[in-house]
Amino acid sequence: MGYLICNLRKYFIFTLVFLPLKGFSDKDKIKSIVNDTSINLIPDGGKNTEWTFQFSRDLRDWVNIPELSPVYSDEESSAAINYSKWGPIGFFRSMQTEGFYDPKYVRAIELTFEDDNWASQLASNYATGEEIPGMLKFGDETIQGVGIRYKGNTSYQRSGEKKSINISVDKTVVDADLKGYDTLNFNNANMDQTLLKEVLYFNTFKKYVACPGAGFAQLNINGENWGVYSNVQQQDGSLIRQYFGENSGDRWKAPSGRGSGAGDNSGPGGGGPPGGPGGGRPPGGPGGAGQWESGDRALLYLGDDSATYENLYELKKQKTDNPWEILINATDVLNNSPDEDFQNSVEKVMAVDSWLWFLVLENVFTDDDSYWHKGCDYMIYYEPESGRIYPIEHDGNEAFSARDVRLDPLEGEDNPNRPVISKLLAVPELRQRYIAHMRTILEREFNPENLNVLIDQYVKTIEAYVEEDPKKDFTMASFRSGITSLKNLIKTRHTYLSSHTELSKAPPSISSVSIPTVPMNDKKTVIHAQVEGFGDEGIDSVHLYYRSGSTGSYLKSEMLDDGNHDDLEAGNGVYGASIPPFLAGDKVRYYVEARSDNFSKTSVFYPATAESDPSVYRVKSKNTDQDSPVIINEFMASNKVTLPDPQGEFDDWIELHNTTDNEVNISGWYLSDNPDNPRKWVFPEGSVIAANSFLIVWADEDGKAPEGLHANFKLSSYGESVLLSSSDETMNLIMDHIQFGSQETDVSYGRLSTKPNVFEEMIPSPGKPNP
């Protein structure tokens, strides 16, 4: 019996052929044991990376193998082999899952309290939020001393024993986490007898806007089955890093509440029913009309006194010196900028496209815990790199509201207490962008064809667990009828929105947008778009939006079809524009908008996801056409005992050699292990190599080390590249580039002294001439 294992992108794949073949294995990638009766697989990968296993007879159609449970890297999954089912020839692969919040799996969580009276303790502590200690177990992992409390507002008030639960994994054990998460939320799916709505909603929302992941969990508490919960990611630093790369900005929550209005009459504020006498931005307003009519937490400008905002918003995380000034300024710009300068001004303080997606999704999914309805129950993140605030979806348990099935798609456009809606949609260009995004959601996400498939998949995932749930407050008949009602709601809502006057106007079509083949850092990059008007309607305008990097506003350039703007020839429907040169390794994001020559200027985007998922290219750089004074001379990709760094650790190292008789200042040069990103790590100021001397750089991701040069990458012993590039001022020319294969431990790879263009394995000689 033989098997073959190889690495292929995001999954490992091996072939099982029931013939006496020799077995091959990509070492340290996936360990396997196959015999006549069983198969054992141990996938390798990044920390907290989870794998699931699939089978195919033809490498086209793959099915999950229920006998092989999903496992995390370095864990083992095993199953008995049924030859009649898998033979005579079969292909197996290990695919990366979405992780702990993958909705295709029910996570079995065990909680243990020392006191059997734990439920009463949690209820007593609900008002204060005080946690009680417990033990958490997931799979083979056990964490002692986690902090547990009840959570939620309306969900806590529900009848029955099952309450929503929050867990601080690192309550007593510093830096403790469960699969990379230090806070867990298990929600009781209040008012949702399908248990699906929050999970469906969040897994669509997160594709377009910062939003928690969501899946399912089955809780066992003190040995008793407490049934199925929504497993929902915390809106914390890990979520921020997931979407923004960094977690360096302030974060606020706009909690549920009532308050001021925004109109003509001064007054101290509003309130709950029957409403208050006034408030809002000067000169005041008619007061909160009761319930959720106020705008005090909806980014309404309420003056310059920070105390007003501190009483309304919760500052969840402070990273800057003046968070309240930042928030007040954003509300001031949003509410008070003059019309002629509004769009330009608001783009500087708000990520407008992200806010429009946020509004669209809350409306389409009829979310009652929403900005359009309550003006609260959302979060805000300030990204200091761009100076703009972004929305973060907060609560999804009231999505798919049946009473709002015919909610107007432009709900709130005339409501001064919802300025994010009323101010943005008052700009014709942004109004059409909002409508275009809503069309995209209806076409790609919120429609019976798509959501019914997901619903059926989710039902298949949880139905058996729901059957065994002793704490559910509904029957299985209600569960199944709820599924039918949910599907009917989706159909009705989709039909209503699709036939709405604003949405039924057909936009132009963009059939293609060019993808640059080799965009260089020394010349402009030309972009073409093939555009056609709808019916007899012509094209009003076509625009190219672009930016370098992952933050900041997009620049806008008009695309023309006049034969003079890199558009091939006039009048052929191909519009052209160019993007200026950027630095080597920069990721340039871009998308195209076309507007109809009709009264509404109906818009369409390519890709349809616009700024939530734009097209991307990475800028290339040229090789130097002269001999480099500094070369890559030797390196070691697996250093166990050969050479310690100044901190005493045995890490990968790269040796550079100054081949000239003069010292060379390489401050601002770059070192990288990725040809697509040659500017990965920059040499700090003062990096000088003496004449005919050597310099060691530690490839160990230890940039905070006080001594030595430590790059922000490691070398792969399986083989990759090392690049040395010049500074930004000299166009990041590739000065030297080595591509290498698999490396042996404690054996270096370097240039032969007698043949300097030849690299071979050798006895290490760091800091000295090579053999």
Predicted features and spans:
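Structural beta-strand segments of beta-rich domains
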Residues: T37-L41, K523-I527, F650-D652
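Phosphate/dinucleotide-binding and metal-coordinating scaffold of catalytic cores
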Residues: M95-K524, G533-L544, G549-G552, K601-S603, ...
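Aromatic- and glycine-rich beta-strand/loop motifs that create alpha-glucan
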Residues: S541-A584, D597-T602, Y606-T609
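Intrinsically disordered, low-complexity linkers and terminal tails enriched in Ser/Thr/Pro/Gly
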Residues: M95-T97, T484-L489, T495-S509, V513-S514, ...
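Aromatic sugar-binding surface patches on proteins
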Residues: S73-A80, H565-S578, S693-L695, G703-P706
